[in-house]
């Protein structure tokens, strides 16, 4: 029963590197996600949801702050988040919640707020201000490794060695072949299972009349690509959609200077510990085996979602809990001979989004095909909690969709940004002969077209998605498409002009004092 005399609970679940098309509820012909599907059956599935940036830190900055990268300025993993920006955790805390974290947020702290020798300045994996940490699980995964040791599992290999096959068959043989052998830990001992158990224990400690706010941040299906039995075998490598790619990687590299650079950068060891060589040189059989493992990792996370649903129901909180399930960014998974995330392809930025608000059943089971973005999450949660979200945020509330309606003047395109500067080693800067401020791109994607604009003199891209769903033919220089290119370039420029930082621009000092909106700390107070 929904209790109307108090604020609802909030459960924000993020996965890492989950493609938006890899949900059975979204019509995927291979991947099975019964627990995510069950959530969609009681909530709303947003089919055209896109992340705002990549990799993890930039993507999460968009999600947590409700600001585009052009305004939050988190460009890479390790770029500090300006302390003047608030976020959804600070906002929830101002509303009386104690936002509690299970996992990680990958938010680097503002160095100006810390002493020069502060150890938090030596890692990009800081904690978003506003969160109480119940169980931290950063990339080194040491808390989970200690938990494995306590269960009798030898975890001395550390990270990422723990994610190599248990039978000591290395991740790549002399010919580079990929094995689907399982790791030393079981399906009940994965990092996701560990975090789920910690959340369930914490949930059992909560007072029934006090609303809670929890954020579960799962690393999976992020690499290393390995998964325990039975998930390593439930998908046949021969199954799956056709890879979206040219005839060979050389053709991809010749299509644009950025793709040539990225294909040369990707190392197998970043995805399969112990593997040698470049990702681009793997054959289709290896890409298919990796894809089968990736699908298995998604199903393993989905099984943990089932445990979470059971825990929330056992706590008699199911009818009082808003649940948001999404990802930070997606995964190329063999498309264009690449793995990982970044660049401009849909494969890196199209992500899942399911929202269930038990107070809003009118649209239960519906799906939305309008473009939604990661920056919409923060204003949506505020709106669902009864707060007026401030006008300087870049995102918009999805609440009308949850009420089986549609907001006025909704966007007709998705937008995202990608910054490929490398401040620590200046690799990209040297390669392209440009400065760090020029190592970036911006995308506008409509239902029919995608336009990609690069700084630094790199050539633009234009794809006719109705004729070229795989994004293989750049028509930016085709005279027949010049009017389209001009229109989209103008729309992209207008989008950037409209979303210039409004933190103080919406306020004015008058004889009567401050008029308008001032963004303060926390961000969502005026």
Predicted feature descriptions by range:
Residues 482-506:
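A contiguous, mid-protein "functional segment" used to position or interact
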Residues 501-519:
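Short, charged, surface-exposed hinge/linker loops at domain edges
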Residues 1-450, 460, 470-490, 517-526:
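Formylglycine-dependent sulfatase
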Residues 452-454:
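Short beta-strand micro-motifs enriched in acidic
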């Amino acid at each position: 029963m929904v209790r109307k005399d108090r604020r609802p609970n909030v459960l924000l679940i993020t996965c890492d590197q989950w493609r938006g098309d890899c949900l059975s509820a979204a019509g995927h012909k291979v991947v099975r996600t019964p627990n995510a599907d069950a959530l969609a059956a009681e909530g709303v599935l947003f089919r055209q949801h896109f992340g705002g940036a990549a990799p993890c830190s930039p993507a999460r900055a968009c999600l947590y702050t409700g600001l585009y990268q052009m305004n939050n300025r988190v460009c890479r993993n390790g770029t500090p988040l300006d302390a003047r920006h608030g976020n959804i955790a600070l906002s929830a805390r101002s509303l009386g919640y104690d936002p509690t974290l299970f996992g990680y947020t990958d938010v680097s702290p503002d160095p100006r707020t810390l002493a020069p020798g502060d150890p938090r300045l030596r890692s990009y994996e800081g904690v978003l201000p506003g969160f109480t940490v119940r169980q931290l699980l950063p990339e080194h995964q040491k808390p989970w490794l200690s938990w494995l040791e306590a269960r009798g599992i030898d975890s001395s290999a550390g990270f990422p060695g723990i994610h190599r096959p248990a039978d000591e068959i290395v991740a790549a043989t002399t010919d580079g072949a990929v094995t689907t052998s399982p790791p030393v830990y079981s399906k009940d001992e994965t990092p996701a299972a560990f975090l789920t158990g910690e959340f369930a224990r914490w949930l059992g400690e909560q007072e029934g009349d006090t609303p809670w706010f929890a954020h579960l941040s799962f690393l999976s299906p992020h690499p290393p690509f390995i998964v325990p039995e039975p998930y390593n075998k439930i998908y046949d490598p021969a199954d799956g959609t056709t890879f979206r790619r040219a005839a060979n990687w050389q053709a991809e590299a010749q299509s644009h200077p950025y793709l040539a650079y990225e294909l040369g950068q990707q190392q197998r060891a970043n995805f399969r510990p112990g593997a040698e060589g470049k990702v681009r040189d793997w054959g289709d059989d290896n890409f298919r085996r990796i894809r089968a493992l990736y699908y298995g990792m998604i199903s393993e996370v989905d099984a943990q979602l089932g445990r979470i649903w059971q825990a929330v129901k056992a706590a008699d909180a199911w009818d009082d809990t808003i649940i948001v399930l999404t990802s930070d960014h997606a995964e190329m998974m063999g498309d264009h001979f690449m793995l990982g995330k970044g660049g401009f392809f849909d494969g890196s930025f199209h992500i899942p989004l399911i929202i269930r608000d038990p107070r809003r059943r009118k649209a239960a089971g519906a799906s939305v095909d309008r473009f939604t973005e990661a920056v919409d999450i923060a204003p949506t949660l505020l709106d669902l909690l009864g707060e007026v979200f401030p006008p300087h945020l870049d995102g918009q509330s999805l609440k009308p969709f949850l009420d089986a309606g549609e907001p006025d003047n909704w966007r007709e395109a998705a937008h995202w940004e990608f910054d490929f500067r490398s401040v620590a080693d200046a690799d990209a800067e040297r390669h392209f002969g440009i400065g760090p401020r020029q190592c970036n791109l911006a995308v506008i994607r409509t239902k029919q077209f995608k336009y990609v604009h690069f700084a630094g003199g790199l050539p633009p891209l234009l794809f006719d998605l109705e004729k070229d769903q795989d994004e293989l033919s750049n028509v930016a220089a085709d005279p027949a498409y010049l009017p389209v290119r001009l229109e989209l370039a103008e729309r992209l420029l207008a989008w950037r002009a409209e979303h210039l930082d409004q933190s103080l621009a919406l306020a004015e000092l008058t004889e009567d004092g401050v008029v308008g909106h001032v963004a303060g700390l926390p961000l969502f107070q005026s």
